[in-house]
Curated annotation (Swiss-Prot):
Effect of residue 127 to A: Strongly reduces E3 ubiquitin-protein ligase activity
Annotated PANTHER family: E3 UBIQUITIN-PROTEIN LIGASE AIRP1, ZINC FINGER, RING/FYVE/PHD-TYPE
Underlying gene: AIRP1
Natural source organism: Arabidopsis thaliana (Mouse-ear cress)
Top-level taxon in the UniProt lineage: Eukaryota
Name of the featured protein: E3 ubiquitin-protein ligase AIRP1
Molecular function GO labels: ubiquitin-protein transferase activity; zinc ion binding
EC class of the enzyme, as a word: transferase
Miscellaneous note of the record: Plants over-expressing AIRP1 exhibit tolerance to severe drought stress.
Reactions listed under catalytic activity: S-ubiquitinyl-[E2 ubiquitin-conjugating enzyme]-L-cysteine + [acceptor protein]-L-lysine = [E2 ubiquitin-conjugating enzyme]-L-cysteine + N(6)-ubiquitinyl-[acceptor protein]-L-lysine
Amino acid sequence: MGCCCCLPSIPESSRTIDEHLPLSRATPSSLSNAYSSPLSPPIPLAITNINLQTSPPKLPRTQGNSSEASPGLTQVVPEKKTWHVDDLTDFELKKQYREAIDECPICLEEYEIDNPKLLTKCGHDFHLACILAWMERSEACPVCDKELVLTES
């Protein structure tokens, strides 16, 4: 057997010499008509515009239980909820957070005896070497961007 080009039913004389030329060397007239003819436009999709559909008019809303509003048009406003918050200050919360995460925010390494941590007035702690190098470039805390003041301890 063989491929479709090798079938005996197709005479070799029907093949043209253009079949063996690369497209870059072929003349434009020898290119297929599919490449030179314009493409047909795409088939349009059936689109329905949601904005064109009619909707019932919106009724005016009133708050509360006024006597002049009809019962179908009133809106009940829920009561204000209060949330219980512990009596912890921001500094105490930051202290609890620092104890939970015991690493320097600049270098992301844990604190060790060789490289101690230093606490700032804004409540953040850093390696001594890291914060001193930071203070050469900036006067703001690397975490909260407040003025960087070191504590005396």
